[in-house]
């Protein structure tokens, strides 16, 4: 059973119910973190501080519930270094999985308004693949990768349009990693995260 929720929606009653369900069937709880950076979190209106995420992960871990964390690569204003800081932070958390999502700009959103006003650019396919590979190289080899890209609804997608060719992006990822002779965890240094 996979349940996607916000860290600030995990009260004691919900945690108790999830623990009970976990005795019947394995439960994975998916939490949307997106980024560890407060300025970016405020811009995208995440709506809770990093400490709330940390408390939720701690509470889920204490109940032996598996945790998958959603991150977004390419958020406006974030550098590659900041995105890697989010990955390195997650290496220190008692989580079991990660979803690495590309930023999608969808029609009818404030993000779309900012994009169309030229306030930020989305990542090119090459930039995304380079950044994604760097994230994978730094990611603990013990974490299960549940997603490395996604595709927004085609009728709403403004940018990046290349992301709608999901299979091709995945094929390029596999090819580039093979050519570079790299893999998940290649640059992971466990002693940095203890």
PLM region descriptions:
Residues 91, 97, 105-194:
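Auxiliary Fe-S-binding modules of radical SAM enzymes
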Residues 19-21, 48, 86-87, 116-118, ...:
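Short, hinge-like loop/turn segments at secondary-structure boundaries
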Residues 1-48, 52-55, 61-62:
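Conserved SAM/AdoMet-binding glycine-rich loop
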Residues 53-54, 79, 83, 128, ...:
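Aromatic/hydrophobic pocket-lining residues that form the small-molecule binding cavity
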Residues 1-3, 27-31, 67-71, 96-100, ...:
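Hydrophobic faces of well-ordered beta-strands that scaffold small-molecule active sites
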Residues 38, 60-82, 102-107, 114-122, ...:
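Conserved strand-turn element in the central/C-terminal portion of the radical SAM core barrel
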